[in-house]
């Protein structure tokens, strides 16, 4: 698949923002305007004799070189299938754990100065004893909720940063596991065609299927982690 991890993150975040009446393209345009303004100021500094500016050597995200993602390695599955499966799984995750998930995001009390620390704390706890597909779904859902919370609290500037943090973590920490466990093809096999919702309607044991090793107790643990100030 030719889609990058960043494109997958943006699609999911854009979808979550749209559910709350927000528009990703508007946020992206604002971010680009801020970037252009900063670049102009930096170029002015160069023209005024500053030796500190250097053109970027390559594509980086938050200082980390972007490697080939598992989406690029596994080219059989269609990008649209992965995106739709991830959207559906995220919706089902949030439906099942709406209260715990709402408590989690509301307890963050994020600010531009503390957002990364909060993101890192929750994500590290989520994957502290391993990776599985359910936790990857939870990771995307958390990042999407954090973006929505940022916009709701008039901190729109954080959305682009959160997307970059998610992309970096997905590329650096989750891609190896994804590649070793069937790639995104396997994810689509498990979660495609709104499989999570169908299992719930069929009264299957949803917890064991979606959040293997990351059950409700694990979600609540994240909430208790954030309540320890």
Swiss-Prot record:
GO terms for biological process: apoptotic process in bone marrow cell; cellular response to alkaloid; cellular response to amino acid stimulus; cellular response to gamma radiation; defense response to virus; dendritic cell apoptotic process; dendritic cell proliferation; ectopic germ cell programmed cell death. The chain crosses the membrane at residues 206-223. One of its GO terms (molecular function) is BH3 domain binding. SUPFAM superfamilies: Bcl-2 inhibitors of programmed cell death. One of its GO terms (cellular component) is centrosome. It is found in: Mitochondrion membrane; Nucleus membrane; Mitochondrion matrix; Cytoplasm, Cytoskeleton, Microtubule organizing center, Centrosome. It comes from the Eukaryota. Highest expression in organs with lymphoid development. A motif (BH1) lies at residues 125-144. InterPro entries: Apop_reg_BclX (IPR013279), Bcl-2-like_sf (IPR036834), Bcl-2_BH1-3 (IPR046371), Bcl-2_fam (IPR026298), Bcl2-like (IPR002475), Bcl2/BclX (IPR004725), Bcl2_BH1_motif_CS (IPR020717), Bcl2_BH2_motif_CS (IPR020726). Gene3D superfamilies: Blc2-like. A motif (BH2) lies at residues 176-191. Pfam families: Bcl-2 (PF00452), BH4 (PF02180). The keyword Nucleus applies. Keywords: Apoptosis, Cytoplasm, Cytoplasmic vesicle, Cytoskeleton, Membrane, Mitochondrion, Nucleus, Synapse, Transmembrane, Transmembrane helix. A motif (BH3) lies at residues 82-96. It is a single-pass membrane protein. A motif (BH4) lies at residues 4-24. Belongs to the Bcl-2 family. Dominant regulator of apoptotic cell death. The long form displays cell death repressor activity, whereas the short isoform promotes apoptosis. Also acts as a regulator of G2 checkpoint and progression to cytokinesis during mitosis. The BH4 motif seems to be involved in the anti-apoptotic function. Intact BH1 and BH2 motifs are required for anti-apoptotic activity. This is Bcl-2-like protein 1. The gene is BCL2L1.
């Amino acid at each position: 698949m030719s889609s990058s991890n960043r494109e997958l993150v943006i699609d999911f975040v854009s979808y979550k923002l749209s559910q709350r009446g927000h528009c990703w393209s508007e946020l992206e345009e604002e971010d680009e305007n801020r970037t252009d303004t900063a670049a102009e100021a930096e170029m002015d500094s160069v023209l005024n004799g500053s030796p500190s500016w250097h053109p970027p050597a390559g594509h980086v995200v938050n200082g980390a070189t972007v490697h080939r993602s598992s989406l690029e390695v596994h080219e059989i599955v269609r990008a649209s299938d992965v995106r739709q499966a991830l959207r559906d799984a995220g919706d089902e995750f949030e439906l099942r754990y709406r209260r715990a998930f709402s408590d989690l995001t509301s307890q963050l009390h994020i600010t531009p100065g503390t957002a990364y620390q909060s993101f890192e704390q929750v994500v590290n706890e989520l994957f502290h004893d391993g990776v599985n597909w359910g936790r990857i779904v939870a990771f995307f859902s958390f990042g999407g909720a954090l973006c929505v919370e940022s916009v709701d609290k008039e901190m729109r500037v954080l959305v682009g940063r959160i997307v970059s943090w998610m992309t970096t973590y997905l590329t650096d920490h989750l891609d190896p596991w994804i590649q070793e466990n069937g790639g995104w093809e396997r994810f689509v096999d498990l979660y495609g065609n709104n499989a999570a919702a169908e299992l719930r309607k069929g009264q299957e044991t949803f917890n064991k299927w979606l959040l293997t090793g990351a059950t409700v107790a694990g979600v609540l643990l994240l909430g208790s982690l954030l309540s320890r100030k």
